[in-house]
Amino acid sequence: MITIRDLNHLLVQVHQEKITEPDKLRDPFIWGDVFLKELNRNPNQMILHIWPMENAVILGMLDRELPCFASAKQTIEAKGFYPVVRNIGGLAVVADEGILNASLIIPDNMTEKISISNAYLLMVELIRTSFSDFYQKIDHYEIEGSYCPGNYDLSISGRKFAGLAQRRIKDAILVSIYLSVNGNQNKRGQLIADFYEEGINNQQCKIDYPQVVPDSMANLSELLDYPFSLAEVIERLHLALRQLGFELTTLNSHSELMSDFKELKDKAFLEKNA
């Protein structure tokens, strides 16, 4: 199995953006595909993409199969949130000013291929390193009652604070994390619980949607008893990568990247309005 230290010969390029406008909610997912394409062209690097949002609910593609999907989206909008469907695995998650969204884009061109579980464990290792000065153990297993449940839910004392998703294009892998840093996590859980209650509406579903229990989740500030800001957590990610032997630099959005982004954004716009 490959550990994150095995990759520290790669330069980490950091791209950070904050999404505050509803018409830019798809931008991080477009950038994700741009970065996957870039690592297929130039695999001698990794990319750390930091992309917090405000007042958004990121939906999975399977959420569109809800019997009453349209009215479920309206429950989100009625509470002042904007729904957006992502092109990566998983189900609905909240993305507000207390949630850190980040992606690690990794080349998969070594002799030993990086399996799906191995890729997730690279992110787990990064998060554990980022908070290694705290004594609390960070576990990874599915937390029943959480939203967007999965085998790589990150939790402390049985309460989930982060979840992972993954996307692959050829020889590049993107592992994303949403991490509840601060704010009212119980309110976030109730928002998603209400979304599924309205979306299912007592009807039969082919998909096993989660029965969300808000108290199954908490934010990192509560679990570690420290008032983290998003900026502090981002700095911890940077520091952890340096501790693991990586060199970091700010991503240069060169013309080829910008051209790829424009092409994919134009395509997404046409598909949305088709």
Residue positions per predicted region:
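Long, positively charged amphipathic alpha-helical accessory segments at protein N-termini or as interdomain linkers
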Residues: 134-136, 171-274
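Generic non-transmembrane alpha-helical segments
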Residues: 71-75, 79, 126-136, 236-244
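Contiguous, small/hydrophobic- and glycine-enriched helical/loop subdomains that border
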Residues: 100-102, 106-144
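N-terminal lobe of the biotin/lipoate ligase/transferase fold
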Residues: 1-113
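A short beta-turn/loop motif at secondary-structure boundaries
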Residues: 51, 92-94, 144-147, 169
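Short amphipathic alpha-helical segments
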Residues: 27, 31, 68, 115-126, ...
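Aromatic/basic-lined ligand-recognition segments
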Residues: 158-166, 174
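Beta-rich nucleic-acid/ligand-interaction surfaces
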Residues: 140-161, 258
